[in-house]
Amino acid sequence: ALSGFAQQQPMYGQYMFNMLNVNPAYAGNRDVGNVNLLIRRQWLGIDGAPATGSVSYDQRIKDKNFSFGGQMYYDNVFIQKRSGVQGFYSYSAGMGNSTLSLGMSFGVMNYNANYGRTNAFQAGDPALQKVVNAFLPTAGFGALWSGEKWYLGLSSPNLFKSYKSEVNGKSVSMAGKEGHYYITGGYIFSLSDQVVAKPSIMVKSVSGAPVQYDLNMNVWFGERIGVGASYRTGDAIVGIAELQLNPQLRIGYAFEQKIKVVNTTSHELLMRYEFGGLLGKKILSPRYY
């Protein structure tokens, strides 16, 4: 059998903008209904470079400790295309001045790989000219412990290491996704009445790869403008800019440069719209995570 490429969880320069992408316990954390849009293009100028996009919605159920959400996404890398839908559910409980949330996600992913686009394998094998198409279940779990000025999260957005070996009914290829595990944390420092600093960290572990750290620092001015930078160990540096246009709408942009490879920049655009004011629910402002 031919072993295909194990799928990796997409990378996000602005994961702290919407942690629902890495932790299902984040569903409902903002208390109001909100839509998040992400578009990411990596390594511009390289054929088959990664392209990622998603749109998600989550909200807390009124006067309850339950929250729900959903997401549609795609993630394309060279010959591989991945798209799917997910549902999120979380439960929150007060713990003094803090809140503990536990969340789950369930979904289905379509994996498609066109081996006819690559010549990296043995020529002349008709199986390698086929298109692999598989539908795979996905499930995730997460915990989020947070206070007014801090948060700490532990999650695995993909618990299944699920494989399907099928090309026209023949067991010649595998489509899978390795389990990822994340630890996230952040704290908010008030530097003045108008300036707030938010350092944060994400630790990522995946089978077969070294542990990776994302070290981030964002600074907000007057609750309207945010700028920041990130360093992903052994991989990239990231510049971040965010703008709170009004109580409902925030946009963010990230520019990423690989450390070891020149001319491999990435661009990431995010947008969040909150429906609190329209639904009679107060939007939490300021809210930095």
Where do the language-model regions lie?
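Subset of outer-membrane beta-barrel
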Residues: 7-289
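C-terminal segment of classical bacterial N-terminal signal peptides
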Residues: 1-5
